[in-house]
Amino acid sequence: MSESMRGTIGKFALLSMTFAAVFNVRNIVNNNIELGLSSAPIFLFATLVYFIPFVFIIAEFVSANKNSESGMYDWIKQPLGTKAAYMGSFLYWFVNLFWFISLLPNVIAYASYAMLGYEYAFSPMVTSMISIVLFAAATHISTKGASWLGKISEIVAYGVFALFAVYVIGALMALNGDTPPVEPITLEAMTPTINWATLGIMCWIFQAAGGAETAAAYLNDVKGGQKSFIKVIIAAGVIIGSMYAIGSLLVNVFVARGDLSYSGGMVEIFTGMAHYFDLSAPLVGRFVGIILFIAMFGAMMMWTAAPVKIHFSEIPKGVYGEKTTQLNKHGVPVRAAWWQFGFVLVMLIANGFGSESVQEMMSTAINLTAGTAMLPPIFIMVAYFVFRLKHDDTPRDFRMGSRMFGMGMVSVLIVIFIVSMTASAFPPGVDLVKAFFINVFMTAVFAGLAYLWISRFEKKAAKTSTSTSTSTSTSTSTKNKTATQTH
């Protein structure tokens, strides 16, 4: 791998890449549909209690692993060992396979708005075919490295920042006018109902505020190294958390919660604003569709590349085939990226044939990633707890407070995550057997297969090591014996 190709992206490019990976405008609408205006304080809670501390954890791990290629594997390896590091990075990659299935229909919906001014209802099979083409394009671009992704992410960041600012200014102007908001912003409306269903939905808010660890896959591509990375990742955490909270507070100024849809919700709130200000709703819909299509496609490219780098770039040599883990000059395992495309291809075809509607297709994919999406962050948190407990003397430039503060903070996060993950996996009003099969059993099966795979590799490696050691010992003994006889 050519070192001249690395260290090529600046701070704003990294901020843009983090922004593209983490901030997803559809999360504002999706959680508003589920929770109403109470999603705003929950987003604020998630930012303060989870996202910012989690960003500090990432910053500390980065500071302690300056030469890491991908981040997550090395972070877990020192505190928990090779097997846990492999399992953590595998689950991170595995969970994201299902996330692509839920994201791609949104990309198509926004492309439809951009070209037609409205959402065209494709059949699930046609949606799957278009998704395959889009994912193939994203996979190809993602193998071009951080410099390409940085440039694309900068365009995404400018567009989404501008779109967000326009909506916030428009909403504030409307609130200062004579016409009241469609749904009044009151303390009662913002007060969340704490029950089992809410705890499960919080899992998605935590996931919406997560993803900053993906940027660590490009640590070696950043000008200024780990010091620049830490500054940018902390700034990104504060900015993104604030945008989620503000956006969630103002989302129902022009459109009621009940009138929003999962696939086109962001366009719907902008066309609602267009009606309020007597602007052309189709024209605004097309403009917003173009920006959101670019934003979603940019996010997909980040998430296409990062999990592959995290899982395949630093695992021990021999776990997979040599060509599968071989990095190109940009530090990307190209063959692994196309293997990932192959898995998603099969899932898209199966989903297309097995779903009666795109909404059902998205719902199935969302259910498959519900609680399991929280497993990789839990691996990182447990690793951090053990790191502060047993390896706190590791040299690093950044620490999240004292040893006890760091351990206490991450312990609270682990408890919150486990409760939320359980509630998400078993939501109220569903068949518990079906929920167990979809949200627990399938993940457990694949995780079990991964565990057997890495255990088999470790046994084989240990046997080879013992054999080599015995051979070396025998050879040395023979040489010594021959030398003695000669004398």
Task: Go through each PLM region and give its residues.
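C-terminal membrane-solvent junction of multi-pass transporters and transport-like membrane proteins
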Residues: M5, G10, L327-H330, M374-A425, ...
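Membrane-interface loop-to-helix entry segments
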Residues: A111, S128-P180, I233-V238, I366-F379, ...
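Transmembrane helix-loop boundary segments of multi-pass membrane transporters
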Residues: N30-P41, M115-P124, A146-V156, V346-F379, ...
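Membrane-interface "cap" regions at the ends of multi-pass membrane proteins
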Residues: M1-P41, F45, F51-A59, N67, ...
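Helix-loop-helix junctions that connect adjacent transmembrane segments
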Residues: G7, F122-V126, E154-G289
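Membrane-water interface regions at transmembrane-helix termini and the short interhelical loops
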Residues: S2-M5, S63, Y113, V133-V156, ...
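Hydrophobic transmembrane alpha-helices that form the core helical bundles
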Residues: F56-E60, S68-S131, H140, M296-I310, ...
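TM-loop-TM module centered on a large, flexible mid-protein loop between adjacent transmembrane helices
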Residues: D74-W75, G81, A235-M301, Y320-T369
